């Protein structure tokens, strides 16, 4: 919880394990709840049309990237809300992406060989467009409009 602030070991260990198993990213779980990504923030589109990200109260860190794209997603008709994300919720999701200031927006197609919704769908398109618009506007801090 909160290890990105100084204690990187759980994140780097997860990343190393993911690479050894041929994965592109690692997702960190605690007590069957998705907490974070190794160098990104996960965001999933549920069948209710809402994009959910891990809750801060469950141990997730605030995501500058999600904060930056949130208004664009909302404008595209995709509400963004924190939630307690379980593996079963992820597996039934319409779509899942990961976001990070260093990696941008990436679609998640599978987790451990299991297909996750429809990659590069509505959530991916809206998030990517919003992210590119934020980059083009030259934002400097999370508080920039």
State the predicted function of each range.
Residues 1-145:
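Helix-start/capping segments and mature chain N-termini
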């Amino acid at each position: 919880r909160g290890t990105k602030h100084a204690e990187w070991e759980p994140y780097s260990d997860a990343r190393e394990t993911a690479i050894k198993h041929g994965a592109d990213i690692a997702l960190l779980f605690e007590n069957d709840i998705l907490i974070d990504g190794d160098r990104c923030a996960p965001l999933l589109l549920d069948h209710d049309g809402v994009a959910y990200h891990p809750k801060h109260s469950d141990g997730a860190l605030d995501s500058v990237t999600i904060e930056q794209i949130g208004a664009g997603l909302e404008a595209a008709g995709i509400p963004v809300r924190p939630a307690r994300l379980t593996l079963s919720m992820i597996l039934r999701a319409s779509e899942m992406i990961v976001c990070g200031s260093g990696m941008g927006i990436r679609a998640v197609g599978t987790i451990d060989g299991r297909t996750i919704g429809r990659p590069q769908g509505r959530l991916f398109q809206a998030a990517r467009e919003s992210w590119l618009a934020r980059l083009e506007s030259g934002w400097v801090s999370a508080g920039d409009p």
